[in-house]
Amino acid sequence: MKLLNMKPAEKIAYFMTRLYDNKLTTTSGGNLSIMDEDGVMWISPSGVDKAHLTPEDIMWVTPDGVVHGKHKPSTEYPFHLAVLRSRPDLHADLHAHPAALVAYSLERKLPKMDVMPGVSALCGKIAIAKYALPGSQKLGALIAEKFAAGCDTVLLENHGVVLGAESLERAFMMFEALDFAGRTGIAASMLKKDAKKLTETELAVKNVKYDYKDSLAHDELEIRDEMINMCHRSYEHKLFTSASGAFAQRTENGFIINPDDEDVFCTTADMLVRVEGDKCESGKVPSKYAKIAGMIFEKHEEIESIAFARSPYIMGFAVSGAEFNSHMIPEGYICLRNTMRHPYGTLETAPEKIADTISIKTPIAIIENDCVIVAGTSLLNAFDRMEVLEFGAESLCDIEAMNGTIVPISNEEIREIEEAFNL
């Protein structure tokens, strides 16, 4: 994973802005910390607008316990200090109160980490810490106890969540993955379904690696810029997280795709990976979706762009087995047409089944407990379909939450739409 070339104070201000902009914290809530190589802990301040933090606002605590800076440190700094001093392998803490994870903390129940691959591996061992007064030594001791026992993620009763990692970049990716997993679980509950847990054997399927020869140079700058714009847009619209989501775009002799294990929002055009057959750009590792992307492009000349996502509402359908019905509104059907569903593990064990069935007329493939694959005639078309898919899934979840009855467009009305719009 590429780390940002920033000083600790700059990094804390940057990620706090991202937290706030993504509605994962409030003006007064949440705090971030970094322990540097000299044993100095940098931490966000107390009582300063989280939407407009600057590096000059960040506080620091030296090894002798002296606090420096123009504000007061976060009231939670005792537990940051306790955790980072007790775990030398951790160099960053993230604490926040996103709505979905607070819901779990109020129920005093852990979000399911094993309904999608990669979440548990990224977030590490998770536990719940007993409630204690915010900012108290008691709370710090309760949290530090869980981290000392090997946890990297701790849910706080009636409070929020704390994550520790080797870098703030990694902690942020863990946090967004956990939040999306929590929101996916809530969406499944709204559908009155239980999310299917994956077994260790099923999760192990994801250990399959594909080797690519390092032999290509990168080009297609215009395509790369457009892909980055779409990645940012998808992230800002909560379709991607820093840890999940990718686009693939056809080129003359292959395709370009996101790199593996990089923050989606921080990915730059030069980091995207060009793939041709079994070759890719030197020194780069393409997304885990490169294999299926190549197969789809090879089989379907009309498909120019592909999106891969784990957006929470549609993933509620993917992890629960609930049926997604695209016959909701005319605009939705025109955009989405028909969807296909494949069992978990198909990406690794039988990718040709996905490549054979996806098409412009059936552009959506829901891979159970894994992801959705969206095919389009352009990057914008793929993005539009992905966005409409998530909006539609949210509407269906809302109907279930209201204990309502879905009245879809009839088959006769669907035929009328198909004739009118030449579908």
Task: For each feature predicted by the language model, list its residue ranges.
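Glycine-rich flexible loops
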Residues: M1-L423
